[in-house]
Structures are given as C-alpha cells and as structure tokens.
Curated annotation (Swiss-Prot):
InterPro entries found in the cross-reference section: Dextransucrase_DSRB (IPR019717)
Residues forming coiled coils: none
Identification of the protein by name: Protein DsrB
Alphabetical list of Pfam families matching this protein: DSRB
Membership in a protein family: Belongs to the DsrB family.
Superkingdom of this protein's organism: Bacteria
NCBIfam families: PRK10708.1
Record-annotated membrane-spanning stretches: none
Length: 63
C-alpha cells in the first residue's frame, strides 16, 4: 500500500473503519501506516507486523 490508497483499519472491538494512507514507514519488523480517519483527519499510526495475520491492522479497501 502507498500514500493516498484507500484502506480499512482494525480498531479495538469495533467494525473496520475506512481511511486514506497519509504516510508509510518501513521497519524490519513490519510497516507503519499513518491513516486519516473521519474522526482523526490528521491521522493515526497503525503497525502491520510482517509475519502475523493477527498483527495486520491496515488492509486495502476492496469495493
């Protein structure tokens, strides 16, 4: 995923939320995405772990 991609994010206990990627940072353990959400237009950071499906919080939006 890259900047300006539409995505969904997993949050605590609720349904997935739609947002837009503002920034991407690569790390050895995974990738951090700054995602703009309706309630947080400036963005919230989410981390996707490389080797863990449970650690995947940001996914491409499929419509």
């Amino acid at each position: 995923m890259k900047v300006n991609d539409r995505v969904t994010v997993k949050t605590d206990g609720g349904p997935r939320r739609e947002g837009v990627v503002l920034e991407v940072e690569q790390f050895s353990e995974g990738v951090m995405y700054l995602v703009s959400l309706e309630d947080y237009p400036a963005g919230v950071w989410f981390f996707n772990e490389i080797d863990s499906h449970d650690g995947t919080f940001v996914e491409p939006l499929h419509k």
